Structure formats: C-alpha cells, structure tokens
Amino acid sequence: MSTPQTGVRSVHSGPVIALDAMGGDHGPQEAVRGAVRAVREHGLRVVMVGRRPELVRLLAEEDAAGAIPIVHAEDALAMHEGALASWRRPRSSVAVACKLIRQGEASALVSAGSTGGVVATSTVRLRTQQGIMRPALAVSLPTRPGPTVLLDAGANADAKPEMLVQFAHLGAAYARSAFGVENPRVAMLTIGAEPGKGNRLARKTAELLTAAAAQAPQAQRLDFRGNVEGHDLLAGEVDVVVTDGFTGNVALKSVEGAVRFTMDAVAEAMTSSTAAKAGSLLQRKALRELRGRLDSDTYGGAVLLGLNGSVVISHGASRGPAVERACRLAHDLTAGGIGEEVRSRVQSGARSARRQRLGPGGEEQPAG
C-alpha cells in the first residue's frame, strides 16, 4: 500500500501517523530516530513531514534510507512561537501534517513542537468537534490504582465554566475509552477540598458539574466527586481532574519537577557511601521500575481532545525513545478506535452541558 504524495510502498498496515519531524528542542535528528524505532520495532506506519533533503540524509545515517515516507514541508514552527504562528506559517510542518489528516491521508499527528503553535495550528486546520468550544490537552498521570487524566494541561490559559464542563466530558470519555474505566470519577482542581473553595471560575464550574451529575440522563451523567487539591493528583482517588490550562500546566510541571527531584535525591542517597552503594545494587531494579512509572516520557505525550482528528503533543525535550512512544500512543488512539469513541461519547455530553446552561426560556445564562 503506497502512502499518498510519497510513492514509497509500506509493508505495514494500520493507521498512518504524520510525524512533525521539525518540532522539538533537538531538531529532526531525534524525530528520525523515534520514527525508525516505531517502524522497525512496532511495525507502525509513519510518514515524516519536514524538509526532505535533511530527512533523507538523517534516514541514511540510521541505515533506513527509503524506509519511511517523507512529505516535504519547507517551513517549521520555532519553539518560542505561539498561537499567531498558525496564521503566519501556513506551510509549516505542523500545518502540512494537519492537511494530510484533513485529506484522509493520515490518521493522527505527533509533534514535539511549541505547544501553543501546535494547538493553534491543529485547531484552525482540523476544527473542533461539533458543540465543543475549545480542545483540551489531556495528560495521563501515573497512580497506584491506574492513570488519572489531567486536563486542561496547557491548551487554554483562560477558560469559561462551560468549557471546563466540556473538558470534564472529554476527560471522562477518554478515561472510559483508553483505560476501560466504566464510570470515571471526576473532580475539580482547586485550593481546597471543601465545597465553595476556589475562585469564581472554580466555584461556577463546580456548580455546573454538580447539576450535570444530578440532572443529566444516566448515559450522559458525570460522577462528580467535588474538589481535589494539588497533593491529590497522584493519589489515584479520582480518574479525571479538570482545570483551566494555566493551572493545569503549572500543576503538571510541578509534578514533573517533584518527581525529578525525588528520583535524583534517591539516586544520590544510594551512592553516598560504600554501604549505600552495596545496598543500591539490590535496589537498582526497583529504582529503574519506579523511574519508568514516573517518567513523563512513559505515556508518550499529551492528547489534544476535542478536535476532528487525533493529535499527540510530546515534550519539547523528547529524544528518540519518547518520540517513538508518542507515535505508539497516536497509533493506539486511532487503531483502537479510541479517538472515534471519545468523539461519539462527548457529543451527547456536550448537548447535555448546553441544556444545563440554558434557562427556562432557552436563553444563555451568565457564567457567574
């Protein structure tokens, strides 16, 4: 089966992953390494989008000349560029990858580029699902019972209460589809667990979520458990944590920093003396397993929910293995029908949320 616009035959089957090969702190070299791993080790179908001459050279250096199709894109988003870049750079690698999805030539986009630029470009070119105001970045946090979905993790610095209710439906649908949680427990991230805590946005959102939990039809009902605080994110007591993108991104970066500090401190303590070094030999396997569970690269990246297409945004500092995991995540979203199932589930939830915010006369109520 040949991939459109490339002429290169693929021996693999399954969805095509459009990889933005120009995004990320480390440039196309790590993207190429990740793509080669994804194809060789997992049989994924990947098409790299970027500057063809550079990608051809890098593929040859990996002994993979001609192994992965390339779609040329002459431009690229810089890591410092934000939302306006989506308009200024219509020929960027992200924009070209979105075009492949829109034309049915790819099923998902993976990028390690600027979060603001990727979110804006994919939103403009793929459009939001019917009834969805804005997409949300969903990150799976590792906990003992199972992953907790945090959203929004950075797509929308400012949000309205109605948007956060939609994010709750998106997150619950994702938890059901991706992790098999039959009735996801949803909570609001704020400064206190007691009802009424938080700013006006948090209080109004909690009010709407409480109403949705009580009044919506059973099939569309959210299991809203109230508020959680930052120290609850890794407790595993809820399945979905909802917040605005500013708060969510700060919370995510704080968790990543705390995990990194803890792992470094443990490693330092285990090698601080001869006795500790001897003991560390026994603990090394357990430490590697713990690092693997908590490493932000383990889950591949954040999933941009709410668009007409699957988008995975990996960490800007992603190396080859992280890019490969992001490609695997994008493959699972599409091959497993997770993306379509989320879209289907959230449509009914979006309609329910809209009914919740309409008054008796069918007029929009103020956000508070």
Protein language model annotation of sequence segments:
Residues L100-V119, K197, A202-R291:
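Glycine-rich phosphate-binding loop
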